[in-house]
Regions:
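Sec/Tat signal peptide C-region and signal peptidase I cleavage site
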Residues: 18-26
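N-terminal secretory signal peptides
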Residues: 25-82, 90
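Mature extracytoplasmic domains of secretory-pathway proteins
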Residues: 70-110
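Bacterial N-terminal signal peptides that target proteins for export
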Residues: 1-10
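Bacterial N-terminal signal peptides
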Residues: 9-18
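Helix-rich interaction surfaces within compact, conserved domain-sized segments
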Residues: 96-155
Length: 155
């Protein structure tokens, strides 16, 4: 009886998590950056502009810095992170999160290093690496990148 109750509670919890709206930034309008900041309890560190895009930088309470790259049409085309913990990737990837999960699950066990992980899909590139207290990564949607911007511009 107790086991059945525990399983029911786990099932309800998973269903509730799956029902949450996607509030993440990747592929979303620049206004989602504010949503990310609130959802991650982060502070805006600054906004910078470069040729063809702007970068909004936020820092969560654990010290992880997240940069969200916005193209001239106001769409977030890339995110990057660096710090002692990984940020909430579901929050940052939004509608691309399931594509990321599917690609990650298709990688054979043992084929990817624990310290370095890469997903390369036609419309989603994710690179993540690190160890305890030193994580970094980036994700971008090539079709949303402004002309002249390269993956090297996303740090």
């Amino acid at each position: 009886m107790r086991r059945r109750f525990c399983l029911a509670m786990i099932g309800c919890s998973l269903a509730a998590v799956g029902a949450l709206p996607a509030l993440a930034a990747l592929g979303e309008d620049v206004s989602s950056v504010s949503t990310d900041r609130v959802q991650m309890h982060a502070q805006l560190k600054g906004t910078t502009s470069a040729a063809g895009f702007s970068v909004q930088e936020i820092e969560n309470p654990r010290g992880t810095v997240v940069r969200e790259y916005v193209n001239p049409s106001g769409t977030v085309f890339a995110v990057s992170w660096a710090g002692p913990s990984k940020p909430d990737l579901r929050q940052l990837f939004g509608s691309y999160f399931q594509q990321y999960v599917n690609a990650a699950n298709s990688v054979r066990r043992g084929a990817a290093s624990r310290r370095h992980f890469e997903v390369t899909q036609p419309d989603l590139i994710v690179e993540s690496n690190g160890r305890m207290r030193a994580f970094r990564g980036r994700a971008y949607v090539p079709s949303l990148m402004p002309p002249g911007v390269t993956p090297g511009d996303i740090s």
